[in-house]
Design a protein with these regions (language model features):
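Short, basic alpha-helical nucleic acid-contact segments in DNA-binding proteins
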Residues: 66-81, 85
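Short secondary-structure boundary/capping segments
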Residues: 86-87, 154
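Two-metal-ion RNase H-like nuclease active-site motif
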Residues: 93-103
Length: 372
């Protein structure tokens, strides 16, 4: 296999991740390359795709040592990753998606991601043992999310005011909403219908009494009661065909509730990281710190493939037709389009394979308006 693409990847990682030493950067490049080739994040499978770098067991042990290396500062690397991602973004306002995902009863991860074209780019994460109150981060859920968002915000340029979205399992608490206000970000979050809302005129109702099937309504006032009351705007919608309505709360009265649909992009990305792409669920990694390093590999690889999918929109029509049909360009995810184009370039024209990030809506997609 022509190694020019791997050499370019290694050079770019050395440039973009100055906190990594030379061998640490090379280990990250090898892991990313093996992951993309095999579409599996098991160390042994990744090693199988790197025969030119030594005997199978030699390469496997090298990847294991990288994954086990406590000197790799994942938080610092994520700062550098965020800077690289943001320098490649071509839209004005970021939408940050916060969600938790679990790998069975083994591990859980709290992740902050950047919404992009039907998917979400992992920016920063924290892993811990699943379903264990004793092993959950000591600061608790609210401070955990607050800390992750604070890190992401500090890595973004001054003056950038993102929109934060999260589901009711994370957002339904006065403490969480106050934390978001303290961060000085705009937010649009889903809350439970059991919450009580009081209008500016003093009329108080449960949200379950306010949301009506087939209707959409807005109101300004306070969510929750007494010492827990939070001022903001409520957006209620229950579209035909939905099992239940959406009860959305925001500190920005001008935000439309339809923008909350972007939160589902996070679910699609988790699917890509798992059964739809990197097979995260069969990684066999059980240590939270090792999983955080493996997630760095998956995030860099995922961002590159999304970029290739977006860059396909700038390619000539004859190149696009080699990757997907006209309908396929509309219906296939950018992740899958990027993977297809990567493999075609790798085997047909390896010299044309570029290692770059590019997060601009391609001409054949119409998601741009949702981010502006």
């Amino acid at each position: 296999m022509n190694p020019v693409g791997l050499y370019r990847l290694n050079a770019e990682i050395e440039h973009r991740f100055p906190s990594l030493g030379q061998w640490q950067a090379k280990g990250l490049a090898l892991a990313c390359w093996g992951l993309i080739i095999q579409e599996q994040c098991q160390i042994s499978r990744m090693a199988e795709s790197l025969p030119e770098w030594g005997a199978f067991n030699t390469v496997r042990q090298r990847l294991k040592r990288w994954l086990n290396n406590p000197r790799i500062n994942v938080t610092k690397a994520c700062y550098e990753w965020i800077a690289w991602v943001w320098s490649s973004c071509h839209f004005k306002r970021p939408v940050l998606l916060v969600d938790e995902s679990k790998l069975g009863d083994r591990l859980a991860v709290m992740m902050v991601s950047l919404a992009f074209e039907g998917r979400a780019i992992p920016l920063l994460w924290r892993c811990y043992y699943a379903n264990s109150a004793l092993d959950y981060p000591q600061q608790g859920q609210v401070l955990l999310i607050y800390g992750l968002l604070a890190h992401v915000l500090s890595a973004l340029p001054a003056g950038v005011r993102p929109l934060v979205q999260m589901d009711r399992g994370l957002a339904h608490s006065a403490a969480m909403l106050r934390a978001l206000k303290d961060l000085k970000v705009d937010f649009l979050v889903r809350v439970k219908a059991s919450a009580r809302f009081t209008s500016r005129r003093g009329h108080s109702q449960l949200l379950s009494q306010m949301v009506k099937y087939g209707e959409t309504s807005w109101a300004h006032g306070t969510l929750f009661t007494r010492d827990h009351a939070i001022k903001g705007s409520i957006y209620l919608t229950w579209e035909p065909g939905q099992a239940e309505g959406w009860c959305l709360f925001s500190n920005d009265p001008h935000l439309g509730g339809h923008r909350y649909a972007l939160r589902w992009w996070q679910e699609e990305s988790f699917k890509d990281l798992k059964s739809g792409g990197w097979q995260w669920q069969i990684s066999h990694v059980r240590c939270p710190q090792r999983m955080e390093r493996l997630l760095l590999v998956m995030a860099v690889s995922y961002g590159w493939m999304l970029s290739l999918g977006a860059l396909l929109g700038e390619a000539p029509a004859q190149v696009q037709r080699q990757v997907a049909t006209r309908d396929g360009l509309q219906t296939t995810s950018l992740f899958r389009l990027g993977l297809r184009w990567f493999k075609r370039l790798l085997h047909c024209t390896p010299a044309a394979l570029q290692v770059t990030l590019w997060f601009a809506p391609p001409a054949f997609r119409a998601f741009r308006c949702a981010l502006e």
